């Protein structure tokens, strides 16, 4: 694999955890736990090949429509997993950032997020961006509200200025968006940042998306010609 032509920023919609669990007669919680294992493997592989930014779609603003028990279990997993991986962040130089409406989350989840961000803020091998309580439209709406409350004049507004009001404005646009699980849609993920992303839709359910499959998708990206409108 030619590392020079790899994407700088990869985003992944981790779809298929519940269907995987259902197919094996397991609870959705077990599906999410298995999905966490794949996520860690993908992080390790990204570090190995030199990808600098990796974004996971963890929980969307629309996911609140799910069963209360499932949401509670998922939030428990998120809060506990973030804190349990501090050694992993430090050993591998992983900087944690979070996109989404964090302030609307429960105190426990919010505290875990803030602790992870604070602990890893000086690491620089890989930026791991977790989209939690995230929706692309919601992010744009919050950015508009922040702009209106700022000192900027409307006539000065351009793409660069508007981007500065998005969550984590230091993040580059996505070069590659991968969605597992077989569905061909983007589900409100990073609407502003995927303008020129290459898209790959995999039929593989997320708990079965191993680094070998990820490697093939990265190679597929390398063979694509990106014109950026030219």
Swiss-Prot record:
Function description: Catalyzes the condensation of isopentenyl diphosphate (IPP) with allylic pyrophosphates generating different type of terpenoids.
Keywords: Magnesium, Metal-binding, Transferase
Subunit structure as annotated in this protein's UniProt entry: Homodimer.
Organism per entry: Borreliella burgdorferi (strain ATCC 35210 / DSM 4680 / CIP 102532 / B31) (Borrelia burgdorferi)
Binding-site residues, substrate: 16-20, 60-62, 64, 66, 179, 185-187
InterPro entries, per database record: UPP_synth-like (IPR001441), UPP_synth-like_CS (IPR018520), UPP_synth-like_sf (IPR036424)
Keyword check for Glycosyltransferase: no
Family matches, as Pfam families: Prenyltransf
Family as reported in the entry's similarity comment: Belongs to the UPP synthase family.
GO biological process: polyprenol biosynthetic process
Binding site residues for Mg(2+): 15, 198
PANTHER family tied to this protein: DEHYDRODOLICHYL DIPHOSPHATE SYNTHASE 2, DEHYDRODOLICHYL DIPHOSPHATE SYNTHASE FAMILY MEMBER
Record-listed E.C. numbers: 2.5.1.-
Residues annotated as catalytic: 15, 63 (proton acceptor)
Cofactor note: Binds 2 magnesium ions per subunit.
Cofactor: Mg(2+)
Entry-linked HAMAP family: ISPT
Name listed for the protein in its UniProt record: Isoprenyl transferase
GO function term, MF aspect, one: ditrans,polycis-polyprenyl diphosphate synthase [(2E,6E)-farnesyl diphosphate specific] activity
């Amino acid at each position: 694999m030619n590392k020079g032509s790899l994407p700088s920023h990869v985003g992944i919609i981790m779809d298929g955890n519940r269907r995987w669990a259902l197919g094996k007669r397991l609870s959705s919680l077990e599906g999410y736990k298995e999905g966490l294992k794949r996520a860690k493997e993908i992080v390790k592989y990204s570090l190995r090949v030199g990808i600098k930014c990796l974004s996971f779609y963890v929980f969307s603003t629309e996911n609140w429509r799910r069963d209360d028990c499932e949401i509670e279990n998922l939030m428990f997993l998120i809060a506990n997993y973030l804190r349990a991986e501090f050694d992993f962040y430090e050993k591998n130089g992983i900087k944690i950032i979070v996109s989404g409406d964090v302030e609307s989350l429960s105190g426990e989840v919010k505290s875990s997020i803030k602790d992870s961000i604070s602990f890893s803020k000086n690491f620089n091998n890989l930026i791991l961006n977790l989209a939690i309580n995230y929706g692309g439209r919601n992010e744009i709406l919050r950015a508009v509200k922040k702009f209106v409350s700022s000192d900027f004049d409307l006539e000065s507004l351009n793409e660069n200025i508007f981007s500065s009001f998005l969550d984590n404005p230091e993040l580059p646009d996505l070069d590659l968006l991968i969605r597992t699980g077989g569905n061909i849609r983007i589900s409100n993920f990073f609407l502003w940042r995927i303008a020129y992303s290459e898209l790959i839709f995999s039929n593989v359910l997320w708990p079965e998306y191993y680094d070998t499959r990820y490697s093939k998708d990265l190679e597929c990206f390398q063979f694509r010609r990106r014109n950026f409108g030219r």
